[in-house]
């Protein structure tokens, strides 16, 4: 089974959208195996967004992601990364289809409500930043 990380960003948490977003992912047939709420600090943000460190928007991204609480969740299932990416929609909500999280709930390209792993390999790394293996729960979903 493939695992992937979902972050509900500060704009999503502040607008009370966490439950709706998590529910959308479960409706895809993905099983939530880890969940926590936290205030991301600059050190964790730097590690999480390290691939973007040299991009011009990096500083603004770190400022935004550390501006309020986030919800981190791990989902598991067949093709979990692909299913979640499709359900999230394009990075820019203005270019996202209706029916996707960003198309329905995103504000702008920065406040786009969610982050999701873009590959199974990156998911493993990202999950390890937010969860220890002992915090992930294996159970039979019925």
From Swiss-Prot:
Its cofactor is Mg(2+). GO terms for biological process: CTP biosynthetic process; GTP biosynthetic process; UTP biosynthetic process. Keywords: ATP-binding, Cytoplasm, Kinase, Magnesium, Metal-binding, Nucleotide metabolism, Nucleotide-binding, Phosphoprotein, Transferase. One of its GO terms (cellular component) is cytoplasm. The active site is at residue 115. Pfam families: NDK. CDD domains: NDPk_I (cd04413). It comes from the Bacteria. Its EC number is 2.7.4.6. Residues 87-106 are annotated as: Disordered. It catalyses: a 2'-deoxyribonucleoside 5'-diphosphate + ATP = a 2'-deoxyribonucleoside 5'-triphosphate + ADP; a ribonucleoside 5'-diphosphate + ATP = a ribonucleoside 5'-triphosphate + ADP. InterPro entries: NDK-like_dom, NDK-like_dom_sf, Nucleoside_diP_kinase. Gene3D superfamilies: Nucleoside diphosphate kinase-like domain. Its main location: cytoplasm. PROSITE patterns: NDPK_LIKE (PS51374). ATP binds at residues 9, 57, 85, 91, 102, 112. GO terms for molecular function: ATP binding; metal ion binding; nucleoside diphosphate kinase activity. It is found in: Cytoplasm. Belongs to the NDK family. Major role in the synthesis of nucleoside triphosphates other than ATP. The ATP gamma phosphate is transferred to the NDP beta phosphate via a ping-pong mechanism, using a phosphorylated active-site intermediate. Homotetramer. This is Nucleoside diphosphate kinase. The gene is ndk.
């Amino acid at each position: 089974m493939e695992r992937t990380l979902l972050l509900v960003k500060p704009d999503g948490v502040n607008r009370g959208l966490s439950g709706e977003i998590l529910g959308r992912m479960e409706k895809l047939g993905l099983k939530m195996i880890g969940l926590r709420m936290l205030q991301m600090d600059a050190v964790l943000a730097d590690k999480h967004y390290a691939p973007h460190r040299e991009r011009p928007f990096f500083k603004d991204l770190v400022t935004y992601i550390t501006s309020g609480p986030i919800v981190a969740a791990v989902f598991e299932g067949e093709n979990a990364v692909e299913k979640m990416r499709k359900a999230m929609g394009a990075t820019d909500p203005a270019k996202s289809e209706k029916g996707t999280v960003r198309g329905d709930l995103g504000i702008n390209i920065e406040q786009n409500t969610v982050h999701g792993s873009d590959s199974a390999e990156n998911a493993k790394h990202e999950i390890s930043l937010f969860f220890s293996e002992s915090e992930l729960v294996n159970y039979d979903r019925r």
